[in-house]
């Protein structure tokens, strides 16, 4: 059975690409036709590519791999946060800070600062500090949480990135490629598919389309985790084999 149906894709508007004047010729193989000045994506190919992305994600998660969800455009922000949290993964849904991957040590220092201020808030330090200082610390905490909250528990570089709109997230794409980190991407008709390891040709502007595809990647991770748990339970409950000596 397919991971996703043609009906689901149609209902979410996954097939609507960009205007024909705003396209990347490299996406030609994923385009079905043109209608009223808009390219229509070939959903038969999208179904296959979603399946490929699902299996890639599931296999990676089954091996303990960590995936960073990236989508900073308005249409993606909520889905990226919700689905990454649902599947226990990391996310960036505000501005991508240059060096998030390539200057990971510096980012870790900022995350440490975030956690230090959180501790101060929790252990009562705020109560004994001057009001003015507390206001400044709260502002700093809010800013750090906004940009780093989704990766504050990411102790190492991710094993893959799931990106919505690689054109918008070109800095993230460049950093991942520099470090040979594989990229799964929702790629619209105006993007360059050659930069992405696992391409999902789809509308990256419709909230419903983004939500549907992002939730499928989260489902793949959860399926892998469920498989691990079931294997552990089976191992624990398996009867011990007795060895008999002749």
From Swiss-Prot:
Annotated region (Disordered), positions in chain: 226-246
InterPro entries, sorted: Ribosomal_uS2, Ribosomal_uS2_bac/mit/plastid, Ribosomal_uS2_CS, Ribosomal_uS2_flav_dom_sf
Pfam family, one: Ribosomal_S2
Example GO molecular function: structural constituent of ribosome
Domain of life: Bacteria
Subunit description: Part of the 30S ribosomal subunit. Interacts with BrxC.
Organism: Bacillus subtilis (strain 168)
Name the record gives this protein: Small ribosomal subunit protein uS2
PANTHER family: 30S RIBOSOMAL PROTEIN S2 PROKARYOTIC AND ORGANELLAR, SMALL RIBOSOMAL SUBUNIT PROTEIN US2M
Record's keyword annotation contains Ribosomal protein: yes
Taxonomic path: Bacteria, Bacillati, Bacillota, Bacilli, Bacillales
